[in-house]
Structures are given as C-alpha cells and as structure tokens.
A protein has these predicted regions:
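N-terminal glycine-rich "phosphate-gripper" loop used for MgATP/nucleotide binding
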Residues: 12-15
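Conserved donor sugar-nucleotide recognition element shared by glycan-biosynthetic enzymes
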Residues: 17, 66-69, 285, 289
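Phosphate/diphosphate-binding loops
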Residues: 203-213, 217-222, 231-233
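Beta-strand-loop-alpha-helix segment that lines the small-molecule cofactor/substrate pocket
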Residues: 18-66, 80, 327
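Predominantly a Rossmann-like dinucleotide-binding segment in NAD(P)-dependent oxidoreductases
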Residues: 57-59, 64-173, 177-181, 189, ...
Length: 350
C-alpha cells in the first residue's frame, strides 16, 4: 500500500507528531503535520534535516499563516509602518495547563481507543477519563505543549515571520513551580532575540497566557480605553507607533500618539497581490491546505515548510522548558542547540 500513498497528514497529539512524520519522510512521503511541529527541540531539528535531505514537500498546520489579515500585517511591518520594532507582546487567555496533582487509579479504556498506541513513545500511564483523550492532553507535559503549543504557535507566527527572527538568546518564564505532570495554568515568558533588519537592535518579546492574560501595561493601552482583543499581538515601534493584530480574521490596527490612524492598504499593496479581506474561516483555511496539495503536484510552494516551522516550534518549546526553571533566565546557544545552563539540556529530547 505504501507505493499508493503520496503524502501523509499527521493530526495526532503533539507527542506523536515526530515519530509518525519521521517514519513517513523515511519512506519519501510528503508530510502535512499539525502545529506545533514537535514536542522537543531535537525532534524539530531532525524533521527539518530529513525534509531537506530528501527534498520533500512539507507544511505545518498553522492555517492562519495564509489568512489575509496575517499576510497583510507581515507586509505592513516589513514596509515599516511602525518603524523599527523594539518589542512584541502576545497573549491568549486560554488555560491549557493543569496545576493539580496527577490523578490516581484508572478507568476502563473506551472500546474505540487503543490506549497503548495513543501513548506512543511517551511515558506509560493508566487511562483516566477526562484527563487525556480527546482534549486535555495539551495540558500534560508528556503529551502536549500547553497554551504555548496551542495558541502560541498561531499568535507567534506573524510577528516571528514578519520580523524574520531566528532563535532567542535568552528565555525566562515567570510561572508556578513545576509539578512534573501538568503545564502551568499561567505563563509569562520573556524572550530576547538578536536584531534583524526590521528590529531596533535586540528584540524583547513577552508572552502571556492563562486566565486574565495579558498583564495590563502602557504598551497595550488602546484608544478611548477600548478593551483589548481576547487574543492577539502588539508590535511596538521604537518611535512609539504600534500595530495591533487581533487573533484572528480582523484587520491590523495602527495606533499613533494614542489614536487609531487609518491604514491606506493601497499604499502598501498597490497591485493588490495580497488579495482581499475574507470573513469565511473555512475559505481562508483552505488556502493553506490547498497550498500543500498544489505543492505536492508541483504547482506551488508551501509557505510554512518544516525549514520555517521547526524554528518557530523551537521558540515555543524553549518557553515550555523555561517553565521548569521559574524566574530563571536561560541562555540559549542556537548554533549548537544547547543551553548554557546544563540542567536545562535534559529537556531538549525524549
């Protein structure tokens, strides 16, 4: 049957992304893998390496990457609508964490579920109704990447792409102490990235998640005391201009001297190459899915291949690793893929 398959779609919990994708790529199959690409940094780098070596078509399932509002925001930032960017703040109030103890005992495994297969290479534990399958696995360290791995990937994507960032220099997560089981219910992660041509020297990036996120501050104050979008990102320029990008399917908003300022889209996209605003989620999502199919047919190129997705995923996973050392600044050696703090390196691979 293998010679009848051209591509594989991986839509499992995070911990099984890499084993399945690597097996498929080892058989020279093109792969569409859901976000985040992997659970561990070592896996992300290996998937990028194999995809390049075998010249495969790959795409990470961050469909919002292809949405008009995100494509527009990328173009606006790169054309300097707020000048050089000195800070990014991103947030989501979702709570894909669990601060309680690991449950005791076990429950009968549903007839439709192969629990051993579902657990894959992860630590083996008894099935417990309501804690893992079908939804809550995101909260558990062995299976998911918390809110960072769910919403963080989507919301990080546009600022990360627009500013052409690489991997961070330092990461610090202010959260509760690790409990060895669940991700924190609230995270406040500060990254510092090397500068690019779109940033003002080094870039500070702050992520907030959990109930009540984000922390109120001057950089997030909106005109007329308007309420912040529930989820989104703010680009802060070095001269005070700001660009708000709600998540999602809302156009970016420019803030100058405490007031909204109209964005002349024709100025930034005179030939209309970016397309038109669309208010249909399925239609917008289909662009990303179909792009992968067209790339497999040799008609297009993927905009979120593993060469890009692996780096974005690495940033996300570094934030979850920092949760193991609350309040401590970790120093990342991106070239060698290791922390200066030796005790953190054990979290880089299975």
């Amino acid at each position: 049957m293998g010679n009848q398959i051209d591509a594989v779609v991986v839509s499992t919990p995070d911990h099984n992304h890499a084993p399945i994708s690597l097996m498929a790529m080892g058989m020279n199959k093109n792969v569409y893998c859901q976000k985040p690409l992997t659970q561990y940094v070592s896996e992300a780098r290996e998937m990028d390496k194999v995809a390049k070596e075998r010249n495969l078509v790959t795409q990470m399932g961050i469909q919002v990457h292809s949405f008009y509002d995100y494509v527009l925001a990328t173009e606006l930032i790169r054309q300097g609508i707020v000048g050089k960017v000195k800070k990014v703040i991103a947030w989501s109030p979702k709570v894909w964490g669990y601060d309680g103890p690991e449950p005791e005992g076990s429950d009968p495994v549903p007839a439709h579920l192969d629990w051993d297969l579902w657990q894959g290479n992860a630590k083996k534990r008894p099935y417990k109704e309501g804690f893992y399958h079908p939804d809550n696995w995101r909260k558990i360290v062995d299976y998911g990447n918390g809110t960072l791995g769910d919403m963080g990937v989507h919301i990080f994507d546009t600022p990360y792409n627009a500013l052409e960032l690489g991997v961070p220099l330092t990461i610090k997560n202010n959260c509760r102490k690790p409990n060895g089981y669940g991700h924190p219910e609230k995270n406040e992660v500060t990254y510092v990235f090397p500068g690019t041509k779109y940033t003002a020297k080094k870039l500070t990036w702050i992520w907030y998640d959990g109930e009540g996120a984000p922390k109120l501050q001057k950089d997030l104050k909106l005109p007329n005391d308007e309420k912040l979008p529930e989820q989104g990102a703010m680009f802060i320029g070095e001269k005070g201009k700001r660009l708000l990008l709600p998540h999602f399917m809302e156009l970016p908003r420019l803030i100058v001297k405490g007031k909204y300022e109209n964005i002349d889209i024709d100025k930034y996209d005179p030939q209309g190459k970016l397309g038109e605003p669309v208010k249909d989620y399925d239609a917008e999502s289909n662009k990303h899915y179909h792009q992968f199919v067209d790339a497999c047919l040799g008609k297009d190129e993927c905009s979120a291949p593993f060469s890009y997705a692996s780096k974005l995923t690495e940033v996300i996973v570094l934030g979850t690793i920092a949760a193991q050392f609350p309040g401590k600044k970790l120093h990342w050696d991106g070239q060698n893929g290791r922390f200066k703090e030796e005790e953190a390196n054990r979290f880089l691979s299975v």
